[in-house]
Amino acid sequence: MASVSELACIYSALILHDDEVTVTEDKINALIKAAGVNVEPFWPGLFAKALANVNIGSLICNVGAGGPAPAAGAAPAGGPAPSTAAAPAEEKKVEAKKEESEESDDDMGFGLFD
């Protein structure tokens, strides 16, 4: 879990990026001081140097895109390979369930202007 100091620097960097201002140590310090947060003096410089050559916008868009996920139909080691004919049938079942759930929401009486 991130400390308060780390979070203050992260939020400061995000605010600066949102305002399309370059992220520098002085600007991070100014935002932290304005927020009234006590931060160890090395954090703003560390974050400013770490984000100097990084496209923050692409970082935001790629959060959670860690690495390749294993295939959904992968067989356990030594087991038989799964049949490929079962995959389209499963997709049709999922689509049918989605359609049913969307239709059932209409009958709940949660309409805004009913």
Curated annotation (Swiss-Prot):
Per UniProt, the keywords (alphabetical) are: Acetylation, Isopeptide bond, Phosphoprotein, Ribonucleoprotein, Ribosomal protein, Ubl conjugation
Does this UniProt record's set of keywords contain NADP?
no
Q: Note down the stretches annotated as region Disordered.
A: 69-114
Could you name the Gene Ontology cellular component terms for this entry?
cytoplasm; cytosol; cytosolic large ribosomal subunit; cytosolic ribosome; focal adhesion
One of the entry's Gene Ontology molecular-function terms is: protein kinase activator activity
Domain of life (superkingdom): Eukaryota
| Annotated positions of the Phosphoserine modification | 101
Family of the protein in this entry: Belongs to the eukaryotic ribosomal protein P1/P2 family.
Q: What does this protein do?
A: Plays an important role in the elongation step of protein synthesis.
Do you know which HAMAP family this protein is assigned to? Answer: Ribosomal_L12_arch
Q: What is this protein called?
A: Large ribosomal subunit protein P1
Q: Look up and give the organism this protein is from.
A: Homo sapiens
